[in-house]
Each structure stands twice: as structure tokens, then as C-alpha cells.
Amino acid sequence: MSEKNALKIEKLTKIYSKKSSNKIKALNNLNLEVKEGEIFGLLGPNGAGKTTFLNILAGTVIKSSGNVNVWGYDLDNNPRQVRSSIGIVPQEVNLDAFFSPRKLLELQAGLYGIPKKDRITDTILKLVSLEKQADSYARSLSGGMKRRLLIAKAMVHRPPILVLDEPTAGVDVQ
């Protein structure tokens, strides 16, 4: 029995064009296959295109060329299906300071159309050790707590793929 591809990338290229003739090739014909159940990491120096690749998956950057396929769905033809299959934890912490972790997770679940009766907010808060801060303002959380809250937001819709950019930055060992 063959393993199913969770993620298949073929000849993925991203070129950033400046107004001048300077072009920056952030990704150049990237090919990658990640099988179901596999844990995979991207390593490389600053500016190697790791975050650009993750931003293409997240839909915040448009690829120049190539194919992105997630669980058999093509990004160009099924962007909503692809993005609902992925939980993204961005490198930058960007949370609304005046919402609580619980409220932020509830809002995120609502964006994915998850009915209130099916939401797992408290379970996720416990999983990332934020149950005691569930009703505090996000602005009162430490940097590591905010990072864990981003992980919780990425998991709220139970995606089969979790993509983390700099996942351990500012997070305590436990």
C-alpha cells in the first residue's frame, strides 16, 4: 500500500520584482513531497525562501509559477480546500491585544464556519497550557504565551497539516 502525499510541490518559483530591473528569486523550482504522517522541517540561512514558501501555502504570497498540491487538491483550482487543510503558525506574533485567548480562538473557529457546539476551544487552550489565561487580554501574555496562542489558533479547525514558521522562538521547553 502506497503512502498518500499530504503535500506535493513541483517546480515552485517565486520572483519578487522591484521597479528597477532587479529581481529577487526567493524560490527557484522547488520540488518537495511530504507523505501522510511524516514530520518535515525546512532548514536554511536567512533569505533562503523558507518563509516565502510557507506564505504561499498560507495564501499571503502568490507564487510566480509551479504547482502546489495538498491532499490531492491543487492550490490554483481549490484554494479554499487547500487552506482549510493547513494550520499556519506565522513567524510574527500578531494578535488583537484587547481579546482574550478564548475569544480569539472562538473568532478563528467562526471564520472556519465551525458551529459553536463543535468547537474545541477549552481543549486547545489546555493543550497549549493557556487554560489559566483563557480570559485575560492577549496583551497581558508573555511572548512565549502569545506564541503558544498562535499555535492554538492554527489548530482550532483541526487541520490535517500544521505548518510552523520558527516554531520554538520564545517558547519555553515545557
Predicted features and spans:
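Walker A (P-loop) phosphate-binding loop of ABC-type ATPase nucleotide-binding domains
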Residues: 45-48
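Conserved ABC transporter NBD signature motif
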Residues: 66-74, 82
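Conserved ABC ATPase "signature" region
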Residues: 106, 110-133
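Conserved ABC ATPase signature
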Residues: 137-141
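Conserved catalytic motifs of ABC-family nucleotide-binding domains
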Residues: 158
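Catalytic Walker B motif of ABC-type/P-loop ATPase nucleotide-binding domains
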Residues: 162-165
